[in-house]
Amino acid sequence: MRHIAAADTGDDEGEGLLVRRIKNGTVIDHIDGGEALNVIRILGISGTTNEALSIATNVPSKHMGSTKDIVKISNRELSKEEVDRIALISPNATINIIRHFKVCEKQGVEIPTVIEGSVRCPNPGCITRTNEPIRTRFAVLPDGKGLRCLYCDSVITKDLTSYII
């Protein structure tokens, strides 16, 4: 088992949070501190799923220079669309695919230039908000800190997680 240090618990003994290894599944590491619950939400994971889930929040990280969150999901590998959604809210995240207790794939997320079907347009008059069978399409702004609807040009720069489907 590997120990993952918890955020300062006031424990001078140096004991941290013990998170069990997973046999198969995905570990999402280097999530921006405080974003783990948003990651869980955008992946559609709720208390009614059968996936074993471990969450560590505000873990000190030398790599990130502050704190990070970690999410472990047993028996599930993420789709490219799910990884793209994570990149929108935590561009430093790392995705580790675990098989038989070993990391067999490790990749950093990349913010896509265009994202389809994963974000709801804030404009109630946008064609994607009608009953037309049209998937949303957003261009990621050059600074990576917002999205522009490719149908109506509405821009989202604040509270992006509330628009992720």
From Swiss-Prot:
How does it associate, per the subunit comment?
Contains catalytic and regulatory chains.
Q: What does this protein do?
A: Involved in allosteric regulation of aspartate carbamoyltransferase.
> Which is a Gene Ontology cellular component entry for this protein?
aspartate carbamoyltransferase complex
Q: Name one Pfam family in it.
A: PyrI_C
Q: Which family does it belong to?
A: Belongs to the PyrI family.
Q: Does the keyword Coiled coil apply?
A: no
Does the keyword Cytoplasm belong to this entry? no
Give the matching PANTHER family: ASPARTATE CARBAMOYLTRANSFERASE REGULATORY CHAIN
This entry's comment on the bound cofactor is: Binds 1 zinc ion per subunit.
UniProt-listed GO biological process terms = 'de novo' pyrimidine nucleobase biosynthetic process; pyrimidine nucleotide biosynthetic process
Q: List GO molecular-function terms, semicolon-separated.
A: metal ion binding
Residues binding Zn(2+): C121, C126, C149, C152
Protein name stated in the entry: Aspartate carbamoyltransferase regulatory chain
Q: Keywords for this entry?
A: Metal-binding, Pyrimidine biosynthesis, Zinc
InterPro entries hit by this protein? Asp_carbamoyltransf_reg_N, Asp_carbamoylTrfase_reg, Asp_carbamoyltrfase_reg_C, Asp_carbatrfase_reg_C_sf, Asp_carbatrfase_reg_N_sf
Highest taxon of the lineage: Archaea
Q: What cofactor does this one take?
A: Zn(2+)
